[in-house]
């Protein structure tokens, strides 16, 4: 944590340590405020230097405060001196954070030296005032056809990303980071909350490989990474989301940029709060969760919004414990979401990427008075066609296509073209596939699907629609396939 400009206020002593929670005694009349950062410095039993940052959670009275540690409490002893910094945890913000990896305290952990930035902000801040909010409903164009057409993101909204292992969450996240930088001139902040350290490392390596992070010129990178992985104490996992959000708020409020904030995984934020709550002695609520669950979630989510200066659009991976959507943690999260993007293993198995399920993914923005009748009508017709195809699949599997009516055969043919046209080559996957990435503007996406639905392209082969950008590319690909087939027949 940057201590620049922090005036040391008061000193206290540790009187009790219970795991990551400690009680500290201060002189009466010199108590720290709630959320103040405390620093414990001293030597452990082996004579080694220890330095731990804690956050005040409760004022117990008689000079006693209860604080939660942001790192391991190994080596701490009763009687050690504790210093009140007089302010909340503060983290570096601004362009120098791009391309770097930070921990919950805002300390770089990527072995690339100090950030060289004296500008810091406290992680606990008020949500923007109502008069500062931008209440105009507008969609956030991603350049990804399936998202923009069927489950569009709201500018300044919150999106839940649901998907198991290996269906393409990471690649979709990296493509969104890449596209917001190119199309919106925006930046991204990634908050790794309570997930695997290996996944955090893999994400960093893949970002370097796909040039989302440019190690040769770090300042040209498009993303800042903040990690508090599952090996960290619950205090760090509970606060790392706020650290990432604070960095994103600076880009929105000071640089007036559109920012993407990724939180992976929002459930772990709740889980960490539950662990801390029990250690603080609070009475548990439903299913053992903390009684302050809705308040903690609201405190984070209400800061993620559009203002008149810029926007923070948040994409949050949501783990659903035991696939129970009524569990208090995912149920509380759903109340804040504007859209859901569901990744399907069946589509991934077919090789259709991004493997976004067009029928399960939803958005509150899919309304004719927001999108216009053209977009809304096209999206509804695409969904109806795909739904009918899904209903017919059992019949096809048992009896075959020949037993279907003429109309149903036509629906199946168009649905298969639509399914393939929903796939798209990604910029960040170029290094793996060799196919150049495509950014498809919304108007071109709508035009393409309207042409497929109208029947004008019924004569084109299905394969022409697979992994292309706009419809002109599909038509050109069909022409080259037919030319190659004619040449082969002539030979």
From Swiss-Prot:
Similarity-based family: Belongs to the ATPase alpha/beta chains family.
InterPro entries found in the cross-reference section: AAA+_ATPase, ATP-synt_VA_C, ATP_synth_F1_bsu, ATPase_a/bsu_AS, ATPase_alpha/beta_chains, ATPase_F1/V1/A1_a/bsu_N, ATPase_F1/V1/A1_a/bsu_N_sf, ATPase_F1/V1/A1_a/bsu_nucl-bd
EC class (word): translocase
The protein's role, per its UniProt record: Produces ATP from ADP in the presence of a proton gradient across the membrane. The catalytic sites are hosted primarily by the beta subunits.
E.C. code: 7.1.2.2
Location in or out of the cell: Plastid, Chloroplast thylakoid membrane
GO biological process: proton motive force-driven mitochondrial ATP synthesis
Example of a GO cellular component annotation carried by this entry: chloroplast thylakoid membrane
Protein name (record): ATP synthase subunit beta, chloroplastic
Residues bound to ATP: 163-170
Membrane-topology annotation of the record: Peripheral membrane protein
Subunit structure, interactors included: F-type ATPases have 2 components, CF(1) - the catalytic core - and CF(0) - the membrane proton channel. CF(1) has five subunits: alpha(3), beta(3), gamma(1), delta(1), epsilon(1). CF(0) has four main subunits: a(1), b(1), b'(1) and c(9-12).
The keyword Lipid metabolism appears for this protein: no
Keyword Translocase recorded: yes
Main location: plastid
Catalytic reactions of this protein: ATP + H2O + 4 H(+)(in) = ADP + phosphate + 5 H(+)(out)
UniProt cross-references to HAMAP family, sorted A to Z: ATP_synth_beta_bact
Keyword line: ATP synthesis, ATP-binding, CF(1), Chloroplast, Hydrogen ion transport, Ion transport, Membrane, Nucleotide-binding, Plastid, Thylakoid, Translocase, Transport
GO MF term (any one): proton-transporting ATP synthase activity, rotational mechanism
